[in-house]
């Protein structure tokens, strides 16, 4: 008897006809992220060391909302690709999402760089009032010694899409074609 691998449904993330990647909600997510990032870019000029805690928390919460949608979009694309690495539509979506995430990440990079460059006293003041966000904010600051300038960080983000991520996707597409026949003895 030959085992037939069943496909999982990604409809809980983004409903699509025939399990495909043609969900209208998917396009809505791209649009929402674009809108939210454009709005988020407006806070760049408001970032300052002595900013009020409530203003800072609003910025962090806004970032969280966008990040949740981005993660959902990325998960959908990754799972669609993993389900069938030979599916051209899934490959295209995976590449589109990776490029889109790099672009959006580059546009919001300024916040992380500002946060890592903030003096310790003001960072502590803001973290002390940040509740559940404290751990996230502390972890961001741990990467301070390994952070480059904004132009350099943008180059790294773009390079990752066409560099290491592209190689991983190629490897997955090739090795997913392998078929192994097993004969169970007993």
Where are these regions (language model features)?
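A well-structured
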Residues: 1-186
């Amino acid at each position: 008897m030959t085992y037939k691998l069943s496909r999982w449904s990604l409809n809980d993330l983004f409903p699509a006809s025939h399990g495909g990647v043609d969900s209208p909600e998917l396009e809505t997510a791209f649009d929402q992220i674009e809108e939210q990032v454009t709005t988020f870019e407006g806070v760049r000029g408001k970032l300052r060391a002595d900013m009020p805690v409530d203003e800072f928390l609003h910025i962090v919460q806004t970032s969280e909302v966008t990040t949740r949608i981005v993660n959902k979009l990325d998960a959908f694309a990754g799972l669609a690709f993993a389900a069938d690495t030979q599916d051209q539509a899934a490959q295209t979506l995976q590449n589109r999402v990776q490029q889109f995430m790099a672009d959006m990440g580059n546009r919001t990079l300024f916040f992380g760089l500002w946060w890592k460059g903030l003096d310790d006293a003001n960072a502590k003041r803001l973290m002390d009032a940040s509740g559940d966000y404290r751990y996230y904010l502390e972890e961001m600051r741990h990467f301070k010694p390994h952070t480059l300038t904004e132009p350099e960080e943008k180059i790294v983000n773009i390079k990752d899409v066409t560099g290491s991520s592209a190689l991983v996707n190629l490897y997955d597409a090739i090795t997913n074609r392998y078929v192994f026949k097993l004969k169970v003895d007993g």
